[in-house]
Amino acid sequence: MKRREIAREEWQHFFDSFSGQHMGWLVGVDRFDEFLDESVQMRHLDGALRGVQSDADEVALAVDDRSSGHLATESIRDPQRIVLEQSEDEVDTALEIDGPQSCIILRFRDPMPAEMVDGIAV
């Protein structure tokens, strides 16, 4: 696996492209929150990706939650780092969004090259 950090000045363009390319793909989302007592809370979500948005203060992703049937949103305030994980064939496999005390890891359930899904309704 290859990991590539996305430069902050590229975040807006990256997320616009990423959302368009991967909208509707099945994902697993893990969120980790660290508290002052050093305990860590973890939440998991499965569903279809609906988009990722970024502004100066926050990165948010929206997923159709399979368990509840509702749109769920996870966000990181004051994001510090965005890392894209890819296979050796440069297929996107995961996205990591790191904040001061929180982290979201989005993993694709069935990663495949984007050109293989062009024109397929998801």
Residue ranges and their predicted role:
Residues F14, D33-F35, A48:
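Short secondary-structure capping/turn segments at boundaries of alpha-helices and beta-strands
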Residues R31-D37, V63-S67, I97-Q101:
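Short acidic, glycine-rich loop/turn motifs
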Residues M1-F14:
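Charged, alpha-helical interface segments at or near domain boundaries
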Residues A48-T93:
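Amphipathic protein-protein interaction modules
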Residues F15, S19-G20:
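N-terminal helix-cap/turn-to-beta initiation motif at the start of protein domains
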Residues H22-F32:
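A short, Trp-centered hydrophobic/proline-enriched beta-strand micro-motif
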Residues L36-D46, S75-R77:
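Short coil-to-beta-strand transition motifs
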Residues E74-V122:
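Helix-rich interaction surfaces within compact, conserved domain-sized segments
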